[in-house]
């Protein structure tokens, strides 16, 4: 005589009501913020390096010149524009180097360390980019309008291509500044809420 024990299957298996997926962790929106952070960083890289490249290649020589005088406008004629090119290149370099930290924030959206590190450095480079963009904007304004009180004449009437390139570079740098502000606000909100 053999004894067998029949064990009935669980009611969940028979009826097909098992757990399909694990419940979502609260704060799953932080991963979305981290992905948006990465995308905005890519846009800021394009804006900052585009501004540096546009300003760095701004150069125009007037078609009329004499044996002794040649009229040329170039970014390296203005120390403010030199500062602009260097700082925008530094900002672009920082943004490239910050991409791995942004990826870590995507993989581990609840980690506070990478976000705090990015907020601190983003704030430092925001001030650098803002100072650079504002000083270049002041010089571009003088190039377009001049200053009657100091007898500075507007040069954009003669150097139109040069002024168009420098103006484009300044606009691009302010786009990078706005993206930095968005990055800082998004990271602060993601750190603040559970």
Swiss-Prot record:
Cytoplasmic side: 1-32, 104-115, 190-194
Residues on Extracellular side: 54-82, 137-168
Transmembrane segment boundaries: 33-53, 83-103, 116-136, 169-189
InterPro entries, per database record: CASP/CASPL, CASP_dom, CASPL
CC per GO annotation: plasma membrane
Matching Pfam families: CASP_dom
Region forming the signal peptide: none
Top-level taxon: Eukaryota
Compartment(s) of residence: Cell membrane
One GO BP annotation of this record: cell wall organization
Major location category of this protein: membrane
Recorded topology in the membrane: Multi-pass membrane protein
Keyword terms: Cell membrane, Cell wall biogenesis/degradation, Membrane, Transmembrane, Transmembrane helix
Family membership noted in the UniProt record: Belongs to the Casparian strip membrane proteins (CASP) family.
Function: Regulates membrane-cell wall junctions and localized cell wall deposition. Required for establishment of the Casparian strip membrane domain (CSD) and the subsequent formation of Casparian strips, a cell wall modification of the root endodermis that determines an apoplastic barrier between the intraorganismal apoplasm and the extraorganismal apoplasm and prevents lateral diffusion.
Quaternary structure (record): Homodimer and heterodimers.
Name of the protein: Casparian strip membrane protein 2
